[in-house]
Amino acid sequence: MFPKIMNDENFFKKAAAHGEEPPLTPQNEHQRSGLRFARRVRLPRAVGLAGMFLPIASTLVSHPPPGWWWLVLVGWAFVWPHLAWQIASRAVDPLSREIYNLKTDAVLAGMWVGVMGVNVLPSTAMLMIMCLNLMGAGGPRLFVAGLVLMVVSCLVTLELTGITVSFNSAPLEWWLSLPIIVIYPLLFGWVSYQTATKLAEHKRRLQVMSTRDGMTGVYNRRHWETMLRNEFDNCRRHNRDATLLIIDIDHFKSINDTWGHDVGDEAIVALTRQLQITLRGSDVIGRFGGDEFAVIMSGTPAESAITAMLRVHEGLNTLRLPNTPQVTLRISVGVAPLNPQMSHYREWLKSADLALYKAKKAGRNRTEVAA
């Protein structure tokens, strides 16, 4: 039974399992990023070093070294990859620690190249593994630093041990080296693919978070206004129709005060769903904040927009909120068709806002068109 080694990754996993979130501080995020980096390096290191055990062992058999070299080889190939992970995962700064581990890999690799007498094929396999790891983890800067460490380590080993340089590889050494030469690049490519896929998904999520309203899933105001500006410019350029709607839930403050904010949130989500069900997929829905929504209906005259909103009104008449079926949602809508005389998209927005004010002043639960 091995003792459970407590580290920060265990802490984050334990907190998630109990429904707790660790404090979101820059330090914690840096630490978690470092742990993810160390975990990505762990598998390639373990496979690469284990795969080099037989090629190195075959060269040692041809000129037997002292017995302790075999212990060092076993420890390097099968213990060091897991020890390096534990060192990095328990470090205050896992990223810096793992970079140090990679440099240690380079030093040890250079040592083994020297011990093998620079035997050409096993040394080439070792060089390939180290170069891929260094370049993939730290780019050209870490690659050059690691390469220098390997060369220096190899030269020092040759000098201290007095081993004769022999570039020739026996057939056995060729056959034992070929599998790792073929397999390791495939493994490295697979790990890189997995990392790229996760990064792309992370980027997509960040993009959604930056453009969508968290409660309803429709566009937030900042992104929606960007789309409105683009639509305004395109319609003016191509002389195309478009209609802008601003929608407000009637007596929303009263709903909040009477039934609570949870019911208010239900009302906002219910209106969002009704708009999504009733309007076209090409209509751009955005939440302005609170209970106010806006819709861009591209290629649509005001009459068609009014007809669509009549269907929304009818749908809301039969809609009941799950926890408060006695509440009936009513909305006021301001409709503003694009006017060629408008010089800025904010004039269009103001026109729809004035139409909304007109609908509220006329008694609410209605749709009004800008004059």
Swiss-Prot record:
Where would you find the membrane-spanning parts of this chain?
46-66, 68-88, 112-132, 143-163, 171-191
Q: Where does Mg(2+) bind?
A: D248, I249, D291
Taking every annotated instance into account, which residue ranges of this chain make up the domain GGDEF?
240-371
User: What molecular function terms (GO) are annotated for this protein?
Assistant: diguanylate cyclase activity; GTP binding; identical protein binding; metal ion binding
Explain how, and how many, cofactor molecules are bound: Binds 1 Mg(2+) ion per monomer.
Quote the record's binding site residues for substrate: N256, D265
Pathway per the UniProt entry: Purine metabolism; 3',5'-cyclic di-GMP biosynthesis
What does the record note about the induction of this protein? Expressed at 28 degrees Celsius in late stationary phase, more highly expressed on plates than in liquid medium. Expression is RpoS-, CsgD- and DgcM-dependent.
Q: Could you tell me the membrane topology recorded for this protein?
A: Multi-pass membrane protein
GO biological process entries: cell adhesion involved in single-species biofilm formation; negative regulation of bacterial-type flagellum-dependent cell motility; positive regulation of cellulose biosynthetic process
Show the catalytic activity.
2 GTP = 3',3'-c-di-GMP + 2 diphosphate
Question: Pfam families from the entry?
Answer: GGDEF, MASE2
Q: Do you know which InterPro entries this protein is assigned to?
A: Diguanylate_Cyclase, GGDEF_dom, MASE2, Nucleotide_cyclase, Rev_trsase/Diguanyl_cyclase
State its location(s).
Cell inner membrane
Q: Which UniProt keywords apply?
A: Cell inner membrane, Cell membrane, GTP-binding, Magnesium, Membrane, Metal-binding, Nucleotide-binding, Transferase, Transmembrane, Transmembrane helix
List cofactor names only: Mg(2+)
**This protein's GO CC annotations:** plasma membrane
EC no. given is 2.7.7.65
Recorded coiled-coil stretches: none
Q: Which residue positions does UniProt flag as site: Transition state stabilizer?
A: K253
**What task does this protein carry out?**
A probable diguanylate cyclase. The last member of a cascade of expressed proteins, its expression requires DgcM. DgcC production induces biosynthesis of cellulose in some E.coli isolates, but not in K12 strains. Cyclic-di-GMP is a second messenger which controls cell surface-associated traits in bacteria.
Task: Write down what this protein is called.
Answer: Probable diguanylate cyclase DgcC
